[in-house]
A protein has these predicted regions:
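Hydrophobic residues within membrane-embedded alpha helices
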Residues: 12-13, 132
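Solvent-exposed, well-ordered amphipathic alpha-helical segments
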Residues: 10-11, 27, 267
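Serine-esterase "nucleophile elbow" of acetyl-processing enzymes
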Residues: 14-73, 80-93, 97
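Bacterial N-terminal signal peptides
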Residues: 2-12
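Phosphate/oxyanion-binding active-site loops and adjacent basic polyanion-contact surfaces
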Residues: 75-76, 259
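Residue-level recognition of conserved structural "scaffold" positions that shape functional pockets
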Residues: 43, 72-75, 109, 265
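Alpha-helical cap/lid subdomain in secreted, periplasmic
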Residues: 81-283
């Protein structure tokens, strides 16, 4: 009996201790910051879909796109200061800043329009310089095309602004995602009818008829309507106002399908022009 007990103790002593936990390898996270207008912001642009579906869990993605903003007004209102603070947040190995403007820098937008030859490129250069000074990697994007058609051909009304972005990217050696060229080629191949399926809201019958004839971008004039009785004033609400989503149909902004489409385009282009980003992208 004593011999069996001694054998048991000897066997127990010879059992190897459990293996130690492997050393913890700390992650090396990156951050992607989106800076731009409504064609990039959530619910009307591609940015929300990009952050939600095209970035891995090893990168934070912050969409700071703001509807109606230009290179001038985005800075003037303080949105760029918010972006700079995001760039300076510690803990990230790489911080990438995607900058896309052009739509609201065009003429006819008081407080937002910029001079194409001087002010617009100067504003872009300043964004690039300050992003680099904050330790971030700026990436310029040409503006998403509008889906205007005339006689079956897409109207390239943003080409001069896209050219200016390309010139600044070349001059300052900034990675460039030529979203304008890529989106214009895609929309041209679709044609006005199919391209309309990527818009917020729904077109009316006149707009559908115009698209079938190869045209889009301007709503045909409606016949004069009989004056309607004034609607009663809505009762005041104690609830705070909520943000506007903007469901009106147009040929600039994107619904969910459109956002998904062009988020994929941006992810693929980023993987090509900046291969170091591939591990954090889902093309």
């Amino acid at each position: 009996m004593i011999g069996l007990f001694a054998a048991f103790l000897l066997q127990a002593a010879s059992v190897a201790p459990p293996p130690a936990d492997p050393p913890v390898v700390r992650i090396k996270p990156s951050k992607i910051i989106l800076v731009g207008d409504s064609t990039m912001q959530v619910n009307s642009g591609w940015g929300g879909s990009f952050c939600a579906t095209r970035v891995t869990s090893f990168a934070a993605c912050v969409d700071l796109g703001r509807g109606g903003r230009s290179t001038k007004s985005y800075r003037a209102e303080g949105s760029w200061d918010i972006a700079l603070n995001e760039m300076k947040t510690p803990g990230y190995v790489h911080v990438y800043v995607l900058i896309q403007f052009g739509h609201n820098d065009q003429p006819g937008k008081p407080g937002r329009s910029t001079d194409l030859a001087t002010e617009f490129p100067a504003n872009l250069r300043r964004y690039v310089t300050e992003a680099r000074a904050a330790g971030a990697i700026p990436i310029l994007l040409t503006p998403l095309t509008r889906r205007y058609f005339k006689d079956g051909q897409i109207t390239r009304d943003l080409d001069p602004w896209a050219d200016a972005v390309r010139a600044v990217a070349k001059e300052m050696k900034v990675p460039l995602v030529d979203l304008n060229a890529r989106s214009a080629a895609i929309i041209q191949a679709m044609g006005p009818v199919l391209a309309g399926h990527y818009s917020l809201g729904l077109p009316d019958a006149a707009m559908v008829g115009s698209a079938l004839a190869g045209n889009s971008g301007e709503k045909p004039p409606a016949p004069p309507a009989a004056p309607a009785a004034p609607a009663p004033a809505p009762a005041a609400s104690a609830l705070p106002k909520v943000g506007m989503r903007g469901d009106g149909f147009d040929y600039t902004h994107l619904n969910r399908d459109g956002a998904d489409l062009f988020a994929g385009v941006v992810a693929n282009e980023l993987a090509l022009v900046l291969p170091e980003m591939r591990p954090i992208l889902i093309p």
